[in-house]
Structure formats: C-alpha cells, structure tokens
Amino acid sequence: MSQQHQAEIPKEIKEKGSLWLASLEAHHPESLTGLDTVQRRELEQVAGLSDFIARELSRHPERIARLFDGLLDKVDRSAFDRELHQALASVTSEDEAKAVLRRYRNFQMARLAWRDFTGKAPLGESLLDISSLAEALIITGRDWLYREMCQSLGTPMDADGRPQPLMILGMGKLGGRELNFSSDIDLIFTFPEHGETQGGRKSLDNQQFFIRMGQRLVNLLSQVTVDGFVFRVDMRLRPYGESGPLVVSFSALEDYYQEQGRDWERYAMVKARALGPWSGYSDELHSLLRPFVYRRYIDFSAIESLRRMKQLIAQEVRRRHLTDNIKLGAGGIREVEFVVQSFQLIRGGREPSLRTQSLFGAIDTLYSLGQLEYLAVDELKNAYVLLRRAENLLQAIDDKQTQTLPDNSLDWQRLCCALEMANEFDLRAHIEAAMAKIHRHFRATVGGEEAEDNHEHWTWQFWNVQEEDHAEALLQDQHIDDPALWPLLKGWRETMSRRPIGPRGRETLDRLMPKLLGELVSMPIPSAAFAPVFNVVEQVLTRTTYLELLCENPGARAQLVSLCCASPWIADQLAKFPMLLDELIDPAALYDITSLDDYGSELRQYLLRVPEDDMEQQMEALRQFKLTQQLKIAAADVTGVLPIMQVSDHLTFLAEAIIEQVVHQAWGQVASRHGVPAHLESGQMGFAVIAYGKLGGIELGYGSDLDLVFLHNYQGSGLTTGERQIETSHFYLKLAQRILHLFSTRTTSGELYEVDMRLRPSGASGLLVSEIERFGEYQQQEAWTWEHQALVRSRFVFGDNQLAARFSEIRAEVLGKVRDPAVLKGEVKAMRTKMREHLLKVDEGMFDLKQSPGGIADIEFIAQYLVLAGSAEFEDLTVWSDNVRIFQTAAELDILPLPVAQQLIAAYCTLRDENHRLTLQREAGQLPAIAVAEHSERVCAIYADVLGHDTDEPPLESRSQ
C-alpha cells in the first residue's frame, strides 16, 4: 500500500483502527511509547484492515515495539528454525511445546499479514515466508517429539543399527512453497526402513513408534488450545486415505503408488516435497516417487484425467453452492494449477526441468520449452498473482480459511485498500477479467466442451417461434405428430419469462432449450415427457451452473430425458436435488454400479474431499453420496442394467457403508469432548449396530427407513479418558444420540435416513443403547413373541468382532427356544390379524402388495413362524435373516416341501419387484387383484397350511374371485 494510498483509507476502516488504538492506549499505554507519528498511523491503519492483527496485538501489546524494530522491513527465513529450536530447547511437556509453537506462529503470522496489507512483500516473497514458517513449525515440532519419544521408548533403528527418522512430505502449496495465509497443511508421514527401537525399556516396532509419533505430531500442530492452533493438518492424501496406516515405510509407499496409485494422486505428487534439512533419505524418497509421477513417455492421458478432476471440482462448487469462489470457480486459482500441472505430467518424464514444485518456475520452463506462448505466460502469471493476493488478504483479515469474495462492505473496503483499487466495482471487474483469461487458457489446454451452432437447428426456431401455425409447421416438417407439445412449451416459456433469472441465466437457458428439445422429440410421445423433464429445469432455473452443465454435456441431456420418462421417482429426485445432475454427464459411469463390497471404500474416498473437522459438510457429503448411489441403482434398475433381484442388495450394502461412517463420525465427535471408555483396547469401540426389518433382511427399498438397535459391552461403572470425563454408560448414550442426530438432521440434501429405534428392549420407553448381556436377558425373559419374530430378521451390521460373536450366540439361543407350536401359531396369527386391521386400506378389486391376504407380510410371517417353531430342532434355521434363504433352508431340512418353498420364493420376489417398480413410478403399492391372483392364492393356501385358517378370513374361493 503506497503512501498516497494510505492517505485514502476509507472512513469505516479508519474508525475501526482509531477505536482499537484508543482502547490500546487506555489499557497498555507503554506499548506505544517511542512510536513516531508515521508509525502510530500505520499501526492504526493495519488494525483497521485486519481483525487478526488487531486481536493478536491486543493480546500481546509488547510485540508492537519489536515489529517496528526492523521486523516489518524484511524477513530472515533462516531465523524461524533457529528461534524455534532455541524456544523448545528447555521445554519438557507437550502442553508447553504447544504453547510455544502457537504463540510463535501467531506473532509471525501477524507480522507477515502486516507486510501483506502494507504492500511491503510481493506475492512470491509473502508465500515463501508463510511456507518457510510452516515448515519450520512442523520440523521443530517433529524434532522435539522425536527426542522426547526416543528418551522414553528408545531410538528406531534399521537392521544395520542406523537411526531411522520420520520423513514428512509436504503436499500441495506447502510442497510448492506457495502456502497461503490460513491454509490447511497436507502431509504424508513415512520412514525409510523397518526395524525396532533400541535403548528403551522394551523394543517397539518402528512402524508402531512412528504411528504414535505421527498421532502426537498431528495433535501438537492442530489441537485448538487457548492459544489457537498451529495449522489444521490433513493426512488424507496418504496411501488408502483415512483407512490406511498413518505412517508407512518407503517400500510400502513405493508399492502403493506403483500398484494402486490413481490419477489424482499423480497430480498431488507433482508438488510433494520432503520437508526439513535435505538428506540422503530425502533423495531416496523423491527417487522412489518420481516414476509414478513422471512417465518415461509423453503422457497425453493426463489431459483426460485433468478433465475428470476439473469436473469433480465443478460438481463441488455446485453442490456446496459456492459463488464468488476465486479458487474453485471457473477461471479460478485451481485452473491455473491444472494448466501447469497437465504440462508437467505430460512432458515431465522427458523434461527434467519441469519436475519442479514451483508453479512460477514451471510456467517459466514451459515458455523456454516453447509449450506456452509469451502472451499466455503473461496473462496466466498476472491473473494468478491477482487472485492469490486477493486470497491471501481475504484470509489475513481474520485468519480464516476462505476463497470467497466478501459478503459485506467493510471487508470489500479492506480488500480494495490493500490491493489499491478504488472500489468494489473496479476490483470485481479486474478479478472477473483475470478469471476469464485463466478459463480461456484452461479450455485451450484441456478442451472437453461442446461447440455447436444452435441457430442452424430447427429446435432453435421451435423454442423461439411465436405463432402457432409456424410451430405446427416445424413439427410437421420433422414428422412429429404431437399436438400437445407446442401448447405445453408455449405456456412454460411464458411462465419462465416472468422469472428473475438474470441475463447470464437467460442467455444460458436460450442456448440450452433447443438442445434439450432435440432430446425430447426423440421420445415416442414428447408431450408425455415434457412435465417431468421441464420440472427439473424449472427447479434449477436460478442456478445457472446447472443450466450450463446441461448445455455443455449432451450425455447429461440424453440421460435426463430418458430417465425422467422411465421413472417419475427419478425425475422427482433430480428436481429436489439438482446436484444429482452431475451424475448424468458420463452415461458409462452412471450405469457402472458400485460392486457390493466397494460401497465402504467408495464412501471413504468420497469423504476425502471434505474437511474432516467440518461437521456440516461431512453430513451433507454423506447425504449426497447416498442420493448419488441411489440414483445410479435406480437408473440401472429402470433400464434393466441391474437385475431387479439385486436392487435390494445394493440398497442394503449402501446403507451399511453409511452406517459405518456415521458411527465413526459420531464416535470422533463424542470422543473429542470426553475421551473414550477406559476399558477399550486400541481400535475397539465396544459398540454394535444391529439391523432389523428390511435392512436386517437385506430387503431394503428406495424409501425404506432403518430399524436399528444399539448395543455395548461394558457392565462396570468406569469413566472415559478425556478431560471432561463421563461414565462409560453415559458415553454410549451420547454416542447413540449423536448417531441419531447425524441420521435425522435435515440439510440441503435432506435427511440421511429415517431411523426407527422402537424394536430395542422395552421399545420407545427403553434405553437408546443396551448392554449386550442385558439385551440377552430381555430377549429370554421379557420379550413378546412378536419381538422374537422381529429378531428373526435381525443382523449384526457394524461393531467389534467380540460383540458380533456374542450377538450371534444370543440370537441363536433365543430363536432356538422350545415353543409350543399351537400357542406359537395363535400368537403369530393374532399379530398378523392385528397388523392387517391397522394397516390394510385397499379399494375393492385392488391388492395391497404388503398387507392384503397372500401378500408380502403373510410370506414374512410364514418365514418367521418356521424359524421360531423349528430352530430348537434345526439350528441351521437361525443362520439367515432374509426370507429367501430361510425358505431355501427349510426346504433343505424337509420342513417345507421344495415346490412349496419355490412357490413362496417366487411369490415373494415377484411382489417385492412390483413394489420396487411402483415406487419408481411414484405410485401406491397396490395392483389389481387379478394381476397377482396366481401368487396371492398360493400364498394364502400355504399360510393356511402352515398356520391354520383364520375364522375371520373369507374362504379361499371367495378371495380368488
């Protein structure tokens, strides 16, 4: 900020700084002693520009004099390491180390922010200063922990007796020495060789030593204390992400990237850099990573990978409703990085000079190699500098991680002042021009967008035509006999013309509609497809990014029309949750259904894009994953790609993957406040989730809720390990409450699942989570027959192996009790009659697939009776929780004749499939009785044979009429 510009500080900033200075003078007058008029004015202005600087100097006013004693003029980066090592030399406790690191970080960041706001540091210098500070904090923290742990546990050694260090890869902007002010730091921990510690009380495996050290280092840097934090640490870029070990050896790292490394990990590794003093281990680490990142040949496949990654980022921008985002939006910072990294990955194998972590260094090399023209280099550099300066200043205002332009006048004034712009309008214009240039170069590099002249297509005329005669003539010319189409389109167009969608939205809609109409008229009856398709468009009318998505992706338009025609339920989902439109872009990916065993790993991968500590985004991501996968299942269902028998399997395995993540998130949130139950060993939870009903029976439908029961295995009265200790039983209660909260909270993407806990012991009046032995006692001594029927369909879906084994024992024991067949028949039939009286509401001549006599419920009751009546003699009947395999087992044991079992299975599958189909058509689960008479009559007859006739049921003859 020049002297001239300092004189033009806006009034609001001046007043804010003046009030702060007056308060400081009143409380700490000694801190201003010795400052001249120019220095006081600069202090006042900077306090008005940055809440973070003002806050930090209010806490430590003694630092003001130090800053003016030469610290603002230049930064000696080598001093960071020296001063931190001196400060930590006499520290003996982790809490003290945390305080030292945080206070040093805050002081230096205030100093660097001051230099940014006053124009004392060019961008490159500022980013290098922040990166050097971050590296010094990480490495001195690492070295202090290493010394402390070696004293207590011994020193990790390789087979030849050489000490082994913890090596840290700095990823992203930290690796490139381009870290911005409030960025997370992405790290990967590794060590050279396996071995054991020497010199401690007992030897410890090197990997275990370094995992403990890594956990403590993450905590040392990221835990929030009274002094704040050093950096938010993200470890999810390590091999296998969150599910992988925190620290792996060099050889394991090399094996992973050679065998399983993915395209996005190649991009991440372009900027990877071993932190700390360079050593032979640093060389070794970079050498083993190089073949994965840089291929020996010119690798144009990197372009397609980049397109996919950019597509994912665009999806995130839409899903998170990000506007004015100068990092992720079109033409943002990330697109510059993509342009440069794509060239690095394509040619870095042949051109060693491109193997640099520095973006500016790579751009200069690309120019010298003739890969970028001077104009492109000049535009990309200048645009990037403006956006990075704006990003850095935005974050330095209040030490917050943001890339979004301000939403208030004061912060706009601060930004304009620091960037020497007259006003918000001028700065916006400069930023928009910069982003337009970046996006132009990005498109020139990666392409992938559709170019088509709509004006030459008849549908452009049809969309714009005003006269009915002209519209009808256009349809006749195309041999389209659908008189209802033009009135529908005309009415919709008139309605939309009154909607305030802005000039950009209007222009995009006018480009989209001819293309969408081209897809619509390919349907057998275009007017029949009009309402579901255009309802989706109407829902995204004010979300221009989604209109652009449909405009630029012919595959997405084709899938939108075909799926909306095939299923009103899918159309409804797309209208309610527009982010699902992203899934339509690539038809091959849409119909590439996740395999049953991969839902868990897919979900873990999906959650990598979301900050671990952002609970709201984590909850939203879970819902978006569910909606996305559900859409893929439904799309494959209605098009016949997925056999209808497998639909429930996929919906069930999807739910189980989500349950696992919800429990882990809930556990982390409760444990962060209270610690964990003290009786647990590492990796244990002592907690289990039991599925009942459709989830337990592996028969989940599209709209099914989850019947769950929670169990734990602690009988004592111990406490948790955290600072806010609570009783273990109370911990598990809080865990259950948090799980239910994560499921039921309604976010932008709705509720995750509706969870029904009424099947727990004592129902709605019982505890939310039961101790497992108490659960067993309840089932043996207090549960009603209908609760044992429910237990037939129960299944362990999450938890410790010990709990899984004990639950299986309890379930088998309860189901295997000796029961009086006559009494059991009476109780089962009474419950079925009661259910029918409450739930069966059907018009004459119609058949309710679930509740009508001969329907799904009758089949389920037959299965439950067979298990309860026969398990005392035939233990195999307790193995399965799903109806189909219960009937198969009953046939194998000669409890049911094979033809009868086959008839029940056929009827059950048919009725369930019809129910799926009706759900996708958004219709009630009812059909004309005649349509299912063959199956229902057989079921009624078998029900009567197994359980006996009900006196209040009509005879079979009248039911079949």
UniProtKB/Swiss-Prot annotation:
Record GO terms (molecular function): [glutamate-ammonia-ligase] adenylyltransferase activity; [glutamine synthetase]-adenylyl-L-tyrosine phosphorylase activity; ATP binding; magnesium ion binding
Species for this entry: Shewanella amazonensis (strain ATCC BAA-1098 / SB2B)
The encoding gene: glnE
Region (Adenylyl removase): 1-450
Any one Gene Ontology cellular component term annotated for this protein: cytosol
Function summary: Involved in the regulation of glutamine synthetase GlnA, a key enzyme in the process to assimilate ammonia. When cellular nitrogen levels are high, the C-terminal adenylyl transferase (AT) inactivates GlnA by covalent transfer of an adenylyl group from ATP to specific tyrosine residue of GlnA, thus reducing its activity. Conversely, when nitrogen levels are low, the N-terminal adenylyl removase (AR) activates GlnA by removing the adenylyl group by phosphorolysis, increasing its activity.
Substrates-to-products reaction catalysed: [glutamine synthetase]-O(4)-(5'-adenylyl)-L-tyrosine + phosphate = [glutamine synthetase]-L-tyrosine + ADP; [glutamine synthetase]-L-tyrosine + ATP = [glutamine synthetase]-O(4)-(5'-adenylyl)-L-tyrosine + diphosphate
The protein's Enzyme Commission number: 2.7.7.89, 2.7.7.42
Protein name: Bifunctional glutamine synthetase adenylyltransferase/adenylyl-removing enzyme
Region (Adenylyl transferase): 456-961
